[in-house]
């Protein structure tokens, strides 16, 4: 659910509430010389320490090579791998974790879904939409710190909330397969430790960019056809 804060506009069509649930250790972005070649080297070097999925690796290299993030910290959500990768402004991987994503498969959101009470969102519409989004920190109606991906659509990154379902969610994250990580209303919800240690310092201090990779079409198609045009409209 959304709350007070500045309105945001997604850079691609379709959005719904994103919540990240994950746990992982934080990395530190090392200083490196300016320039695209150096940034791409950082992406390649870090893959050995925190293996990127093939799709996330392709996306990260494309983003840095095209400077699509315009020097802002950015995150990549790989729904198929159920994993979140956070990068610093130079393209250095600073943290990664398993993630819960929308329980329904699909890359698009139904208009108005973000305005519904959680219990009223149809099962088929509980998707995590793919695309490129400008992010900004804020607070929801309960005063909880979140990272808004699209405020008007209620799309945000936030901590897992303490309730009866928390233990089950942690079990899903701890499992060896990403198949049981399709468990949110469409949100991306992270474990408090990961949110506080990685999301807050890198995406919670100012503007950023969140890339949600598609699951119904090739990732190369998303970046080859959409990103070059979208990058002209960076926040």
Named regions from a protein language model:
Residues 2-15:
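Bacterial N-terminal signal peptides that target proteins for export
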Residues 25-37:
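Signal peptide processing junction and immediate N-terminal pro/mature segment
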């Amino acid at each position: 659910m959304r709350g007070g804060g500045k309105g945001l506009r997604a850079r691609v069509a379709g959005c719904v509430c994103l919540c990240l649930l994950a746990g992982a250790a934080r990395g530190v972005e090392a200083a490196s010389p300016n320039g695209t070649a150096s940034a791409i080297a950082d992406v390649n070097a870090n893959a050995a320490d925190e293996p990127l999925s093939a799709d996330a690796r392709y996306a990260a290299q494309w983003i840095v090579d095209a400077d699509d993030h315009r020097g802002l910290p950015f995150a990549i959500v790989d729904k198929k791998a159920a994993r979140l990768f956070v990068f610093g402004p130079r393209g250095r991987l600073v943290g990664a974790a398993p993630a819960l994503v929308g329980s329904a498969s699909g890359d698009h959101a139904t208009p108005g879904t973000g305005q519904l009470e959680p219990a009223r969102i149809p099962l088929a519409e509980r998707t995590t939409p793919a695309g490129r989004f400008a992010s900004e920190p804020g607070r929801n109606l309960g005063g909880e710190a979140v990272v808004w991906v699209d405020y008007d659509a209620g799309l945000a990154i936030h901590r897992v909330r303490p309730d009866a379902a928390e233990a089950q969610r942690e079990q899903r994250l701890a499992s060896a397969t990403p198949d049981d990580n399709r468990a949110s209303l469409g949100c991306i919800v992270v474990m408090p430790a990961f949110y506080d240690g990685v999301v807050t310092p890198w995406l919670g201090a100012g503007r950023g960019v969140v890339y949600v990779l598609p699951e119904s079409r090739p990732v190369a198609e998303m970046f080859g056809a959409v990103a070059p045009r979208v990058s002209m409209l960076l926040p």
